[in-house]
Amino acid sequence: MRLGIALFSLIGLCHSVSALIAFPGAEGFGANAVGGRQGEIYVVTNLNDSGEGSLRDAVSATDRIVVFAVGGVIEISDRIVVSKRVTILGQTAPGDGITVYGNGWSFSNADDAIVRYIRIRMGKVGDSGKDAITIAEGSTMIFDHVSVSWGRDETFSISGTASNITIQNTIIAQGLETHSCGGLIQTGGGVSLFRNLYIDNKTRNPKVKGVNDFTNNVVYNWGGGGGYIAGDSSGDSYANIIGNYFISGPSTSVTAFTRGNEYFHGYVETNYYDPDRDGTLNGNELGVSASNYGGMALVDTKYDYPAVEYQMTPGEAVNYVTGYVGASKVRDSVDTQLIAQVKSWGTKGELISDEASMGGPGDLDGGSPPTDSDGDGIPDDAETEIGSDPNTADSMELHSSGYTYVEMWANSLVPSSYH
């Protein structure tokens, strides 16, 4: 038990911080991430790569909730390394939100991270052989409505001793050639992948080993390296694969599932595959046989992992993914192009070696900083609505719900449910 939580319980709070989910709608292995709830507020006030008021400075210390008084593109030269117990609330940015461009991020050992509504676009100028997002150690993290693209090794990779991680409602796109990988998901500590879009990655969409729940995802236009790669290893794996839709695109030359073996144990249910690239979404359910699932060892009983609240059909998953995933409070030009590719139902899409073909990170409307009289990160007009005081810096005080007031405000800006 965390010391902070133990102290809270000793003074008789009527709710337990540890019992809260990270935000309404958080699911899976990482749903109980605490983030910076027991720390301090940090307001990002500029688009600089470093220094006071920058995003890099914001995530450099533990126990922070990060909000934004500015929108736009933050160009970074070096990788961003995130500290423990940090919450990043990209939905609080004005205008078109935040894109971080030019290099990747490390969340290794960033225990209890909560990351929402932000675009992380690495690009050709980023460090060679590095991921757009990497997690090699650490526990209890959740990534929600993130748009991540253009990794130079993997795009979103989880490995090593990392445990209790959720990636939900996220776009994982266009790992750059020649590697062009969606990502390794290779840890025995538990990873939930719910309602995500993997698109335009030559391989590893994802490559899974260990404990994994892969539910209601859409995989589009994978290349010859493979769609869902089932372990390809003598290490034991135990996965649920439920309600997903695999759609071939112009670059697709292999079937949806590859490289399974007797060590990869999969519970499979109602997964669809549309291989014909004819401009119409008309796939069929994959029969429950090892030959349809890359030779993995199929099991009859679903693994008892923390599940989605509502399990969609594959068709519902496609509708949801094309409408709402990624940093979708305002979709930028990159995500708009990617979604248009999916909705071509096989006729559009490409593997890229340079983000210039997508127009780079594009331009974002920075919006206007809100009036915040007490400087606590919550705009004055919102404070009245949520019951805090616009003249007192009280954003980190706990509401009766157990969330801080700043979390209450941020949660109110975006949908709390997907069904």
Swiss-Prot record:
Residues 350-395 are annotated as: Disordered. GO terms for biological process: cell wall organization; polysaccharide catabolic process. PROSITE patterns: EF_HAND_1. Residues 1-19 form the signal peptide. One of its GO terms (molecular function) is metal ion binding. Gene3D superfamilies: Single-stranded right-handed beta-helix, Pectin lyase-like. Glycans are attached at residues 48, 164, 201. The active site is at 204. The keyword 4Fe-4S does not apply. It comes from the Eukaryota. InterPro entries: EF_Hand_1_Ca_BS, Pectin_lyas_fold, Pectin_lyase_fold/virulence, Polysaccharide_Lyase_1. Keywords: Calcium, Carbohydrate metabolism, Cell wall biogenesis/degradation, Glycoprotein, Lyase, Metal-binding, Polysaccharide degradation, Secreted, Signal. Ca(2+) binds at residues 274, 276, 278, 280, 285. Its EC number is 4.2.2.2. Residues 373-386 have a biased composition (Acidic residues). It is found in: Secreted. It catalyses: Eliminative cleavage of (1->4)-alpha-D-galacturonan to give oligosaccharides with 4-deoxy-alpha-D-galact-4-enuronosyl groups at their non-reducing ends. Pectinolytic enzyme consist of four classes of enzymes: pectin lyase, polygalacturonase, pectin methylesterase and rhamnogalacturonase. Among pectinolytic enzymes, pectin lyase is the most important in depolymerization of pectin, since it cleaves internal glycosidic bonds of highly methylated pectins. Favors pectate, the anion, over pectin, the methyl ester. This is Probable pectate lyase C. The gene is plyC.
